[in-house]
Amino acid sequence: MTDSDQSLKVLEELFKNLSVATADNRVEAAQEVASFLNGNIIEHDIPEKFFEELAKAVKDKKTSANFLEAVAHIANEANLSPSVEPFVITLVPEICAKAGDKDKDVQAVASKTLVAISKAINPVAIKAYLPHLTKSLETTNKWQEKVSVLAAISALVDAAKEQVALRMPELIPVLSETMWDTKKEVKEAATATMTKATETVDNKDIERFIPQLISCIADPKQVPETVHLLGATTFVAEVTPATLSIMVPLLSRGLAERETSIKRKAAVIIDNMCKLVEDPQVVAPFLDKLLPGLKNNYATIADPEAREVTLRGLKTLRRVGNVTEDDVLPEISHAGDIETTLGVINELLKGENVAPRFKIVVEYIAAMAGDLIDERVIDQQAWFTHITPYMTIFMHERNAKDVLDEFRKRAVDNIPVGPNFDDEEDEGEDLCNCEFSLAYGAKILLNKTQLRLKRGRRYGLCGPNGAGKSTLMRAIANGQVDGFPTPEECMTVYVEHDIDGTHADTSVLDFVVSSEVGTKEAITAKLVEFGFTEEMINMPISSLSGGWKMKLALARAVLKNADILLLDEPTNHLDTVNVAWLVNYLNTCGITSVIVSHDSGFLDNVCQYIIHYEGLKLRKYKGNLSEFVKKCPTAQSYYELGASDLEFKFPEPGYLEGVKTKQKAIVKVSNMTFQYPGTSKPQISDISFQCSLSSRIAVIGPNGAGKSTLINVLTGELLPTSGEVYTHENCRIAYIKQHAFAHIESHLDKTPSEYIQWRFQTGEDRETMDRANRQINENDAEAMNKIFKIEGTPRRIAGIHARRKFKNTYEYECSFLLGENIGMKSERWVPMMSVDNAWIPRGELVESHSKMVAEVDMKEALASGQFRPLTRKEIEEHCAMLGLDAELVSHSRIRGLSGGQKVKLVLAACSWQRPHLIVLDEPTNYLDRDSLGALSKALKAFEGGVIIITHSAEFTKNLTEEVWAVKDGKMTPSGHNWVSGQGAGPRIEKKEDEEDKFDAMGNKIAGGKKKKKLSSAELRKKKKERMKKKKELGDAYVSSDDEDF
């Protein structure tokens, strides 16, 4: 007798013992069967006949409980043999049926057996086991069976959490249906199992909302409130099938709600979550549930803003899910289907002469391979560990491993492949190689992306405004990036664009010494190497220009022995000489650099690699910026400003009385000199220029030459020490400072809309109310004591109240103080009555009361209909002209905007009053390449004058015609076309009733049309008609308005 025959004989005997066992010795008989089966059965032998008999015995009412007990013991989680496991799974449908048996003893044993199997099976065999359980839930009418199966699923979650997570899209609908069962016990068990199953949802963003999500399945009335809760959530974690399986039921119901606000929020959640999906196949099973709802809402929602949000969600879903333009859904990958993997392994086993009796084992192996494919486990060792014990049932181990490895390769080839990005090819020391995610406020910036930096390399970090370039730099500097080396392992220094204002009065040397980076001698030597003179080293930081502050920050970073320099806009405020110095320094210093810059020439000359933001990932390209653009043509706007598709538009400037051509000077400066108090010499001296509506002026010069001082005098921020400055009475100037954020830094907790409303709520620009040309100083107060002789009485002006035309100029209504006992001790000035007010010509007033006259001119300009209603819609439309969408303008705080978005807000706010002159100090700071291109085109099309201070020749070369070269306090103009009087060129016509006008309270001003002037013949005809009518009517005749002439 062979060993195999001996084994079969023992099994037959054990089977007989078990079939006649009583309740008292059933457990012992079952243990004997389990011990033998899970022991060392003869190689290449499996007890398939035993399990055929076992299945019949489980069905038999008389022996059912005994043999169920045997299965429970066979499925002992510690001892279940691979040669037995596939056959145990074939019994699951029968065991499920027995869990609903009328005999409570059988029910109990069947339920216990199902839980034992859930705990015992190989976790990757879930695809062979779970379908039996879900089919039982869908088909049975027995509530006891449902409760037992639900308990088995709960046990399976504990045993195979990661594998259940991938099966959630199939499991959740079945559990949801079961939660609606009429039987209380089933409802409670289903809810408990659903709660257990959601433990596989490894997503911190929705973790705390899972109880509400489960409640929504049972009670759809809770959907609106839950959507509201989730609408305020920041999504940063990767979205997996498990996450979507619990979220999609809620979102599909949210899209079908009546309230537009719920539909909008559901679209926002879909938009935010889909951006975090790594693989299109993750979202593929859910497209048919979300896409129709979004499409229907976009077609039917009346609110334009909600429709726009819905469209955004629709576009994101289509992009992430690879949906075509005609909404043909992509095919779901079948790489992990049992049919696919079974076909692959059967093909490989054709020449191996595998006996038909091993078919169940082969199918089981195919199921396990399918799960490994779904998990994207492609490692050879993992496949050997999980599957080799099952392959060796019918093959020798060495041969089994060869076949299994080929099986793995062919199965993996069926997985849909995403884009493959080659990493850098050259060798070198890794300073950083980490994977991380990054969010800012309510926005996800990077999701599970890799950052790899090597020693001595120079990297350019590129991406649009709001992508998170500066945020990434700060996060690295603050140690908030997972896996990035600590300062002890790798010294990383963030070189900021500007030094904190708290150090304004600190000397340059003391500032660096306070950083504890070396001795005074070493620090002084390094500063001298960076170009600082001895005088500059001892100067306060506040007296340094922006370019020298940048060099100071860089010197401090180098003294810290930095391994990595993080340079955020390093060329801001640097003139061409210092930019060339910086290029040479970075190229020769040997320090790894990560650079954010909008200066394409600088990146071209410095960078060896470009790290680009693409779909919440960082992708690395070898080469400088020009090489990057060749590989990525969509980024052409980084290289050519004109290539930008983004469009900005400035509002058309208001009409200026007396200005008939664009050449006429609206600002005129003659022999102007300015000197800061306490300095040894003037900053600028003997400067003359004029500006008109046609001006396109570039102000150039080295750092510290006096460019910003010149502009501050032009805009009224500073008053000249000597010389004359004339500005047209109604001229409005928009001035964006070099440090653009200075405009908004005290309003960070307002939304952009609230900031604009605050700034212009009085009708005037509150940002300009503290300008020097509007403040009354001692000299002004002294001049305002001028005594006027009016109607034979000495008077001083108390106030100026109104303005009217007077010949070719204006005259102003003034109230007075009457002088008594002038020149004596008892001199006094008594306020006069309003009836004593008088009108004084402008020429007489400006000598002594120029600032009061300017205030009246400002109010008259606003009263003439130039004021705009501060409504949310008007502000959103205005900001949209400068690249800010409504979501940012009305729903986001300024604090959460990126640097570029803040600059766009400053541009929008400064141009709110339809300026005649736009003055930009270093506009290339902080704006990305797309925005710079759009700004360049908008300034070119602007109907008013433009004055730009910049070191970027690229930005001004096609924009400006006139150049003011400032050097050593002197200004040399070139290319100018200054005229006296109106000058030549086309005439400007005043546009009547072009658009609605509003007063300071936002009320519409009804403008009556001017009556056409009649000719002499028309007047005679009208007179005859009037006389005829008068003759006919006699005393009853009354003239009408249209008969007056």
Curated annotation (Swiss-Prot):
UniProt-listed Enzyme Commission number(s): 3.6.4.-
Transcription found in the keyword field: no
InterPro entries to which the protein is assigned, alphabetical: AAA+_ATPase, ABC_transporter-like_ATP-bd, ABC_transporter-like_CS, ABCF_EF3_subfamily, ARM-like, ARM-type_fold, eEF3_ABC2_chromodomain-like, eEF3_chromodomain-like_sf
Complex and partners: Monomer.
The organism's place on the tree of life at top rank: Eukaryota
Protein name: Elongation factor 3
Domain ABC transporter: 426-641, 667-993
HEAT repeats: 5-42, 43-85, 86-123, 125-162, 166-203, 205-241, 242-279
Pathway: Protein biosynthesis; polypeptide chain elongation
Binding site for ADP: I42, H44, S83, T392, H396, E397, N703, E922, N925, H951
Function: Ribosome-dependent ATPase that functions in cytoplasmic translation elongation. Required for the ATP-dependent release of deacylated tRNA from the ribosomal E-site during protein biosynthesis. Stimulates the eEF1A-dependent binding of aminoacyl-tRNA to the ribosomal A-site, which has reduced affinity for tRNA as long as the E-site is occupied. Assists translation termination by stimulating the release of nascent protein from the ribosome by release factors.
Pfam families, A to Z: 4HB, ABC_tran, HEAT_EF3_GNC1, HEAT_EF3_N
Result of knocking out the encoding gene: Inviable.
Compartmental location: Cytoplasm, Cytosol
GO molecular function: ATP binding; ATP hydrolysis activity; ribosome binding; RNA binding; translation elongation factor activity
Name of the encoding gene: TEF3
Biological process annotations from GO: cytoplasmic translational elongation; cytoplasmic translational termination
Family of the protein in this entry: Belongs to the ABC transporter superfamily. ABCF family. EF3 subfamily.
Enzyme class, first EC level, given as a word: hydrolase
Residue ranges with Basic residues bias: 1007-1031
Catalyses which reaction(s): ATP + H2O = ADP + phosphate + H(+)
Annotated keywords: ATP-binding, Cytoplasm, Elongation factor, Hydrolase, Nucleotide-binding, Protein biosynthesis, Repeat, RNA-binding
